[in-house]
Structure formats: structure tokens, C-alpha cells
């Protein structure tokens, strides 16, 4: 369905602007990716609203997705399965962050977990990123360096958000800060895991199981 819609849009645009086949394929790929992204965001938002976990699930989704854009990582063989897994994992993380285990957790422990995850994150990104796939190979060394640099910049932005959250918590006592911090921490952790061999095996296992169900 998504593929047919993106193909229809690309053909319409290419026809109107008199584009060649190469440009048409680029438009089709971009449209396909955009539709999948919108489906993920809207699905997570609606399901999140139903269970009062929209903020946590969306923060996790955006955190992992933005870092993934630069760092790459293991992918499902099917883009549809990949989208479905992203939605499911985001919702599960939303429930986890809102669980009594984390809501009752001491703030200093959350800060400690954050420190550990960011040290782990910088190490993994510096060592492995960007991780390409068969479908999306990174062909030039220049692009690899640019993507690694982008990954480190994104990770640093997340770190500054965490530091700002800590300052806000201690100065204003905003309890919402805990949820925001945990969602970012878990988003960083998950994306960095997908850059590793273990993450690749894990996603392949989930992918195989999901394909059998579908």
C-alpha cells in the first residue's frame, strides 16, 4: 500500500516536472520514507494517548530515530516490519518509563544510569558508527567521517539536554524531568545497541520471529 502510494506520487511529480527515471526513483524513495515516518509518529502518538504514555514513547522514538539517521545500525529485512517494530518498541518503552519501578526510582540513580549509558554511547558511536547495511551501503570514506561526526554531535546535544534536565529538576523540582531523561537515555541505549554485533543478532531474531507471525 505504502509502496503503491509513493510510486503514484513520484510518477505524478515526475510527470509534472518532466523528471527522468533517476530523479523519479529518488522522489519515490523519499516519499516512501516520509510516509513510513509519519505512520510511526502518528501511531505512537495515538496509542500513547490511549495509555497516557505519548510523551515518553515519542521522546524515545525521536531520540533513537534522529541518532539512527547519522549512526546507521541493524535493520529489519522488510521496511514494513522495521516500522512495526519501531512502533512496538516505542510503546513498550513508554510503559516502562511510566512503570512504578522507574517513577519511584531515586533521581540520583537515574543520573547515574544516564552517565553509564552516555559513556557507553560515546564509546560505541566512536568505535562502530556509521553502520551500513546491504540495502544502504556507505560507499565513500568522506561520508563515513561526516556521519560519525554527525552522530557524535547528536549524542552531545542529547547530553546537554540531560544536563539541563538535571538543573531544572534540582532548581524547580519538575517531576516530568525524570520521564524525559529516562526516555532519552533509553533511546540512546537502544540505538547504540543496534550498532553492535549483539544488536544485529537480536534484530535478526526478532525479524525472523515477526516474519513467521506475519
Curated annotation (Swiss-Prot):
Pfam families: AgrB. Keywords: Cell membrane, Hydrolase, Membrane, Protease, Quorum sensing, Transmembrane, Transmembrane helix. The chain crosses the membrane at residues 41-61, 82-102, 109-129, 154-174, 182-202. The keyword Nucleotide-binding does not apply. It is a multi-pass membrane protein. GO terms for cellular component: plasma membrane. Its EC number is 3.4.-.-. GO terms for molecular function: peptidase activity. SUPFAM superfamilies: MFS general substrate transporter. It comes from the Bacteria. It is found in: Cell membrane. One of its GO terms (biological process) is proteolysis. Belongs to the AgrB family. HAMAP family: AgrB. May be involved in the proteolytic processing of a quorum sensing system signal molecule precursor. This is Putative AgrB-like protein. It comes from Clostridium perfringens (strain SM101 / Type A).
Amino acid at each position: 500500500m505504502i509502496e503503491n502510494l509513493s510510486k503514484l506520487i513520484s510518477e505524478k511529480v515526475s510527470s509534472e516536472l518532466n523528471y527522468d527515471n533517476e530523479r523519479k526513483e529518488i522522489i519515490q524513495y523519499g516519499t516512501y520514507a516520509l510516509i513510513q515516518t509519519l505512520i510511526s509518529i502518528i501511531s505512537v502518538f495515538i496509542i500513547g494517548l490511549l495509555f497516557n504514555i505519548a510523551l515518553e514513547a515519542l521522546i524515545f522514538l525521536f531520540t533513537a530515530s534522529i541518532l539512527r539517521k547519522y549512526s546507521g545500525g541493524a535493520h529489519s529485512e522488510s521496511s514494513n516490519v522495521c516500522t512495526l517494530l519501531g512502533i512496538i518498541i516505542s510503546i513498550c518503552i513508554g510503559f516502562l518509563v511510566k512503570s512504578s519501578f522507574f517513577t519511584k526510582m531515586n533521581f540520583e540513580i537515574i543520573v547515574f544510569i544516564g552517565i553509564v549509558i552516555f559513556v557507553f554511547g560515546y564509546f560505541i558511536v566512536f568505535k562502530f558508527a556509521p553502520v551500513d547495511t546491504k540495502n544502504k551501503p556507505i560507499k565513500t570514506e568522506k561520508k563515513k567521517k561526516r556521519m560519525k561526526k554527525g552522530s557524535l554531535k547528536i549524542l552531545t546535544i542529547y547530553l546537554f539536554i540531560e544536563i539541563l534536565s538535571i538543573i531544572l529538576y534540582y532548581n524547580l523540582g519538575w517531576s516530568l524531568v525524570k520521564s524525559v531523561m529516562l526516555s532519552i537515555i533509553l533511546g540512546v541505549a537502544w540505538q547504540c545497541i543496534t550498532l553492535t554485533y549483539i544488536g544485529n543478532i537480536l534484530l535478526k531474531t526478532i525479524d525472523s520471529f515477526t516474519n513467521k507471525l506475519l
